[in-house]
């Protein structure tokens, strides 16, 4: 078995919390492989291609990928080509606002928000 039953159940719980977001993502997808388990794929829809894949080794790693994608959406929305380290206060406020409903359902993963934000100068 790729994951213990407990690990698989926890990954599934995180996946369900982010399910709508995952379905709406255009730059990434989460797929199941019988060989390795969950894989986070960097994709493009127009033109169609698959770039890279990262193995989702735990519920925390899935939560990290989803929270990071939400932040990247904000950076894309503002048209700024940067990451957390150069984020302005309005971008940070919007990122935190978008994270809030997910972290409310997954409070044990709130530390991931801090890890992502620790990339700030």
Set out the residue ranges of the language-model regions.
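Acidic, low-complexity, intrinsically disordered interaction modules
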Residues: 32-106
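Short acidic DE-rich linear segments
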Residues: 118-121
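Long amphipathic alpha-helices with heptad-repeat character
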Residues: 11, 15, 25, 99-102, ...
